[in-house]
Amino acid sequence: DDVFRAGRNGSESFPAILESHTPLDLIIIMLGTNDCKTVYGATAGIIGKGVETLLEQVKKYSPDSDILLISPIYLGENVYKEGFDVEFSKESIQVSKNLEAVYEKIALKNNIHFLRAQDFVSCSETDQEHLDAQAHKIFADAVYKKTDEILKARFIKAAC
């Protein structure tokens, strides 16, 4: 839970969102960067447990959906420094890098699709944590290709 901003725990509203949008062919989950903030003191493993909670909710409320888990980009090396985002620390950078291995294991364990954002883009130099406009376009293209692949396979399987 975000101690500074109420209503930021997505797992509380996620079941209602899933139920109200069923049936869903594909659910995409990409989160974890904000969980790297110093205030939470979370490791990549702890953040991964949160992802697993969401996956359990998907399996309960939308069991026929395909799932794509995306590991987020790494935080920039200067993100914690003055002029950037002091809610992060030097340790936060390593936690953000560790997320991809944790998420990949979760994807394999749960037999779901996986994509690494860092394979396509990295954070902007401007703020050391978000994508710039060009990176958004590149990443959107990568996600489109992956979702197209998943949905084509899904529809071929359904037609058989």
Protein language model regions, located:
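Structural beta-sheet core signal
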Residues: 29, 68-70
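Substrate-gating cap/lid alpha-helix
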Residues: 76-116
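Conserved SGNH/GDSL esterase-like catalytic core that processes O-acyl groups on lipids
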Residues: 1-63, 94-98, 130
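Short acidic/His/Gly/Ser-rich catalytic and metal-binding motifs that mark active-site loops
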Residues: 37-38, 76-81, 122-125
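Carbohydrate-associated surface elements
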Residues: 73
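Conserved beta-strand termini and adjacent loop/short-helix elements that scaffold enzyme active sites
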Residues: 70, 117-120
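Histidine-centered active-site loop/cap adjacent to the catalytic His
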Residues: 113, 127-160
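Alpha-helical structural signal in soluble globular domains
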Residues: 53, 57, 61, 102-110, ...
